[in-house]
């Protein structure tokens, strides 16, 4: 059966939904959930359940003291995924905190590392179909190691992994975390382009 050809969205598709009502149905420590009644641009009324989150920061910490860059990866158990995952250091932005301040705090808390040079290199939505969480990936360079202060419920192993090995871990299916995949691939492409 031939597939239907899709045409490009018309300008009218850019209209914003009209929120008719919004009710918080859950409020927790990390996120809340709202059930919103909205009117679509075509006039249809629908219910949208949205997980509300303050946003997250991700730290692409790179050690450049050797022959090739090494990426700081963490290995920790994630209850929701029910497995140990390789990730970049990351965390939630606290109320009233800037993304950069949150990134600096999370890097120290989780790993003990500090960085002298910071630059936001990526910004994206984690899963925009039902979640408003944004993620900012910060490149952190010129690292020095101090003492970590992870939260009581965090058990994190830190590893400096050569970039080629981190790429192999992605392409061999050992890294399942989307933000880690995005950050490591960004670094490899930035180096390839001469932008690093």
Regions found by a protein language model. Name each.
Residues 46, 56-58, 63, 92-178:
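Unchanged
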Residues 31, 45, 52-56, 66-68, ...:
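Short connector loops at helix/strand junctions that flank enzyme active sites
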Residues 167-196:
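Long hydrophobic alpha-helical segments typical of transmembrane helices together
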